[in-house]
Amino acid sequence: RRHTRSFHVTGVQTCALPISLGVKPRDAERSKNFFALGLVSWLYSRPIEGTVQWIESRFKDLVRESNLAAFRAGFHFGETTELFEWPFQVRPAQLPAGEYTNITGNTALAWGLVAAGQLSRLPVFLGSYPITPASDILHELSKHKHFGVRTVQAEDEIAAAGMALGAAFSGHLAVTTTSGPGVALKSETMSLAVSLELPLLLVDIQRGGPSTGLPTKTEAADLNIAMFGRHGEAPLPIVAAYSPSHCFTAAIEAARIALKYRTPVILLSDGYLANGSEPWRLPDVSTLPDISVPFATEKNHVNDDGTEEFWPYQRDPETLARPWAIPG
């Protein structure tokens, strides 16, 4: 109660008011969300022309007319009632000059993975099992086969992680996507990736929990399982995105760390970032980092007797990463 004293609660009859303006009761119940949208549009001083055009193009006949009536009723209710002292002003964002597009977090993350594949000169492999709110990454990546992206929809979370780990072993930029409960199911594979020292990205689009939780609600509460949710001593890096557009940069950074240090990496996003959108300035490709790493193709150790052999865990003195040798 103490925290709500600064709030003013105003009740609005979202069905009764449209009915008083001639909307049929059944249509008013269906259109009450548009009444609320009209009221919010007035409260935040937003122009309504674009919304009106969208309603006219999206709906037909009586549904269109009832939605338009409810939307306008909500807007004019806010304009004429004395329940609200003042509207809010949403000022245009101050953005640097450049070419922009509107992008969601999941789309930005998928594009970041495609970019990471190009920057590393590796084919991208995604092993995924559909789960809200991470499924859009699978949908988006499946559109980019012309960039060497391979996507597999597995039968379950464990199989998806296992496929991705196998792809990492064979020289791919390997990714598996999931949300909260899927992180638990993939934990054994992630432990194996730590032991094998293979670059594997686990993308966790967090949702409300625990357990199956609330798939359509957002929550950023998986840091604990990301840090400690593996058996034995199996530490790994964690990268977290902070905005929808930052998901692009975060994906490239997670891939860079995984490849350079030969380690699995967990990339954290959440439902709010995944489905939220914002203006994104298209990057200058020439400014993106080169994250390519060489495969081991030659023997790397000389024995006391002068013979040479390959040591799979010979350490790089700078990164302490082992050589990445692929089969064949």
Model-derived segments and spans:
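Active-site/ligand-binding-proximal alpha/beta "capping" segment
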Residues: E233-R256
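Thiamine diphosphate
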Residues: Q53-F228, A234-L236, A241
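Short alpha-helices
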Residues: A16-W54
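Short alpha-helical basic/polar micro-motif
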Residues: K32-N33, G162, S245, I252
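Single conserved hydrophobic/aromatic residue that forms the stacking wall/gate
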Residues: R2-C15
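Flexible, low-complexity linker and terminal segments
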Residues: L95, I103-G112, S120, A250, ...
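Generic beta-sheet signal
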Residues: R1, A16, T177, V203-I205, ...
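Glycine-rich phosphate/pyrophosphate-binding loops
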Residues: P47-T51, L173, T178, R262-L273
